[in-house]
């Protein structure tokens, strides 16, 4: 469905951020991208969705393909029309619009009939949004705003959704609820999801496949269940040592982690 083939990303024509990144996202699956802050995860999503141009970045090598069509270099709105949409970190709802007006805005490329169908679909997965349909979205809770951000993305009827840190700032129960809904969407609507997430435990619990990024490179990949059992993942992303006890990131030197990834 989505293939990223050996891409490099440069900002301001001099700053190399991504260095030969390759990934695949299968149809009807969740693929997660893990990594520390600054590893290049969000840049990867922006390279796929076409947002880099607005931030003086560009894909200088490699290719991004959606199905059989190459989309790197396309403008973001054209990528959206082709069936790929990004849900940004921080939710970014239109705070002065109501919940339903946000959804209508997300469906602006659709016909009136399709917008109505889209709203009904969103409300079927997020009934809490239906209860808040006339409420100004700036007064929604953080969890409700995240639901709205995902629902707004669904209004364009995408085939692929890029999710950037959906658990950020949310209580554990809300995180579990939202990830459960995303899993249902993938299974029932045959969506493909590329998930960037700091909560590695939750991400690997819902994902089918995972990648680990460090300093702009993919350093580890595999089925999610295998990654959950990987000793490096346990130690550095799940915070568990070999005996199963919790381990602080501060107890481990960064160079040791790099050496182990690259060995």
Identify what each model region corresponds to.
Residues 2-4, 18:
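Conserved structural motif at the start of ABC-family nucleotide-binding domains
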Residues 240-263:
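ABC ATPase nucleotide-binding domains
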Residues 97, 140, 153-154:
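ABC ATPase signature
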Residues 155-159:
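A short, proline-enriched helix->beta-strand linker immediately N-terminal to the Walker B motif
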Residues 34-36:
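The feature captures the beta-strand-to-loop junction immediately N-terminal to the Walker
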């Amino acid at each position: 469905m989505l293939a990223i083939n050996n891409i490099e990303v440069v900002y301001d024509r001099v700053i190399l951020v991504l260095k030969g990144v390759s990934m695949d996202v299968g149809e009807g699956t969740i693929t997660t991208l893990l990594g520390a802050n600054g590893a290049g995860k969000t840049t990867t999503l922006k390279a796929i969705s076409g947002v880099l141009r607005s931030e003086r970045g560009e894909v200088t090598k490699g290719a991004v393909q959606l199905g059989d069509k190459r989309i790197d270099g396309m403008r973001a709105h054209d990528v959206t029309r082709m069936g790929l949409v990004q849900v940004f970190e921080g939710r970014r709802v239109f705070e002065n619009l109501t919940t339903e007006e946000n959804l209508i805005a997300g469906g602006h490329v659709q016909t009136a009939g399709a917008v109505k169908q889209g709203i009904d679909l969103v409300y079927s997965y997020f009934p809490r949004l239906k209860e808040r349909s006339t409420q100004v979205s700036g007064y929604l809770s953080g969890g409700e705003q995240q639901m709205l951000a995902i629902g707004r993305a669904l209004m364009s009827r995408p085939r692929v959704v890029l999710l950037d840190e959906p658990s950020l700032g949310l209580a554990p129960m809300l995180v579990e609820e939202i990830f459960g809904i995303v899993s249902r969407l993938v299974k029932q609507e045959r969506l493909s999801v590329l998930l960037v997430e700091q909560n590695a435990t939750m991400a690997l619990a819902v994902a089918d496949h995972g990648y680990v990024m460090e300093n702009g490179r993919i350093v580890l990949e595999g089925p999610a269940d295998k990654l959950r059992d990987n000793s490096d993942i346990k130690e550095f992303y799940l915070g568990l040592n070999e005996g199963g006890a919790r381990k602080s990131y501060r107890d481990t030197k960064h160079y040791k982690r790099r050496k182990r990834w690259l060995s």
